[in-house]
């Protein structure tokens, strides 16, 4: 197993040609928020990653292995809930309210100009629909905010220029619609009952203990 214990945020200082040639490794958020984990890169090499505690790995970062080789991290698509405001019965300000309430619950949130993303949670989904918001399930990379005082991070809490997903979140599974269907009978669920019964636990056998 090849050991990697150095991280270059967004490949800082590396020539673009080196980044293109580097092997890649796809990691979801559950793994990337850990400082120690195992993974397999695009060439089939087994990696043991040992970073300083508190380090958060973002898509576009580069891991440097003990032999000097580099591995570029790709934020893997994963199950997320995409939250948008209801144009018929709400306003864009509803997203601000949603972010406030989710933040009070210490929920990891990815903030985008026109929507929010969180990890699947049927209780939170019901709460958000009750606030006139549209909640749809999809597969997409997840890059939540790191927090203004996040320790050990490397400044990804607010710049996020690296969302080169290349698919504009085209992986929506059509579990919801973009129009609010309720008749304003005060149930305010926008007609989206997404109780699919999934167990949203994510087992990642590659993760090592912190």
Curated annotation (Swiss-Prot):
Residues 144-210 are annotated as: Disordered. SMART domains: UreE_N. Involved in urease metallocenter assembly. Binds nickel. Probably functions as a nickel donor during metallocenter assembly. Belongs to the UreE family. It comes from Paracidovorax citrulli (strain AAC00-1) (Acidovorax citrulli). Its main location: cytoplasm. One of its GO terms (molecular function) is unfolded protein binding. Residues 156-202 have a biased composition (Basic and acidic residues). GO terms for biological process: protein folding; protein-containing complex assembly; urea metabolic process. InterPro entries: UreE, UreE_C_dom, UreE_N, UreE_N_sf. This is Urease accessory protein UreE. One of its GO terms (cellular component) is cytoplasm. Keywords: Chaperone, Cytoplasm, Nickel, Nickel insertion.
């Amino acid at each position: 197993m090849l050991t990697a214990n150095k991280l270059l945020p967004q490949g800082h200082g590396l020539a673009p040609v080196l980044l293109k040639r580097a092997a890649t490794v796809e990691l979801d958020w559950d793994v990337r928020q850990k400082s120690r984990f195992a993974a397999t890169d695009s060439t089939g090499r087994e990696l043991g990653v040992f970073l300083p505690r508190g380090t958060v790995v973002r898509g576009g970062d580069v891991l440097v292995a003990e032999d000097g080789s580099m591995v570029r991290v790709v934020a893997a698509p994963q199950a997320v809930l995409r939250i948008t405001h209801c144009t018929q019965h709400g306003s864009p300000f509803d997203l601000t309210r949603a972010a406030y309430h989710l933040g009070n619950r210490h929920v990891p949130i990815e903030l985008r100009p026109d929507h929010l993303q969180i990890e699947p949670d049927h209780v939170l989904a019901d709460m958000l629909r009750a606030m006139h918001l549209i909640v749809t399930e999809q597969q997409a990379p997840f890059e939540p905010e790191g927090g203004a005082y996040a320790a050990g991070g490397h400044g990804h809490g607010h710049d996020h220029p690296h969302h080169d997903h290349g698919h504009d979140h085209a992986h929506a599974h059509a579990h919801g619609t973009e129009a609010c269907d309720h008749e304003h009978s005060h149930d305010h669920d926008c007609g989206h009952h997404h109780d699919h019964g999934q167990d949203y636990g994510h087992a990642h056998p590659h993760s090592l203990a912190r």
